[in-house]
Amino acid sequence: MKQFKEFKKFKEVKEFKEVKKFKEFKEFKMATVKNFEELAIFQKARELSKKIYPITRKEEFKLDYRFVQQIRSASGSIMDNIAEGFERGGNKEFLNFLYIAKGSCGEVRSQLIRANDVGYLKPQEYNELYNECRKLSACIMNLIKDIKASDITGIKYKDSEFAPPP
């Protein structure tokens, strides 16, 4: 019986250390990002936006000013919301803005489908941009899941009375 209690205690201590080690790793991983420009999803959103602009300068888009504005605005909105959410300094707000960025990513996909349907895009252009949007949306969702699973509340609450107890 005594051996069982010692084993149970050892197992609990080992599990506690593993959990603590994981939390420290997550904190280190999250703490290494100092500004939104370092975020991979921001960089991917920026690349997508940079690809949308030259595509919408093509002859096929010339007379559809409103559509051009919409797709450019939506693609820029992805990166803008990632930046704004990150700069707010709290995870709850960052999550809200990530969901908005994910919604804008869906909006760009919808607009790409429409552009393809009316013949504005070549199949290769459409497939490349559409797949890039899908991947970006998945990356945003993965970051959302990581933040939700994390105990970190964000820089806004560091050394604050609102920070959760250690």
Predicted regions located by residue number:
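Amphipathic alpha-helical assembly/interaction segments
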Residues: 1-166
